[in-house]
């Protein structure tokens, strides 16, 4: 047997019905669309229409909204800054700003930056920070060791 002698078994592959190819084809004239009306015309697709029953979109209640004035913050933790200091990516002499954190790779976009102190009860290095927001605990820890919030 050669490749050019291969063929499908009988009935394994059914030819598709060619519609609108004359009355004798069995799907001619109206091409299975019925007679007249909106759904027999071309370009019809009534989105969300369920045949007169109340559509799903109307049956479900409205929920919430998207506030356009919401500020998106990059959250950074004090221990992330401590790690960057020990790695040598940041220095205690520098003023730590949003741009510096982006350069070092602690944040990945230019949204606002908020400093938190989750899981950090002590902080050794006195730093100068110029960020957009601070948690009260982070503020306290930085000022306790002689750091500045600009």
UniProtKB/Swiss-Prot annotation:
As one GO molecular function, the record gives: rRNA binding
For this protein, the record's Gene3D superfamilies field holds: 3.100.10.10
Q: Tell me the GO BP annotations in alphabetical order.
A: translation
Q: Which Pfam families match?
A: Ribosomal_L27A
GO terms under cellular component: large ribosomal subunit
Does the UniProt entry include the keyword RNA-binding? yes
Keyword annotations: Ribonucleoprotein, Ribosomal protein, RNA-binding, rRNA-binding
Task: Briefly state the protein's biological role.
Answer: Binds to the 23S rRNA.
Family, according to the entry, reads as follows: Belongs to the universal ribosomal protein uL15 family.
> NCBIfam families recorded for this chain?
rplO_bact
Subunit and partners: Part of the 50S ribosomal subunit.
Name of the protein this chain belongs to: Large ribosomal subunit protein uL15
Species of provenance: Rickettsia prowazekii (strain Madrid E)
Q: What is the lineage of its organism?
A: Bacteria, Pseudomonadati, Pseudomonadota, Alphaproteobacteria, Rickettsiales
Q: Gene name?
A: rplO
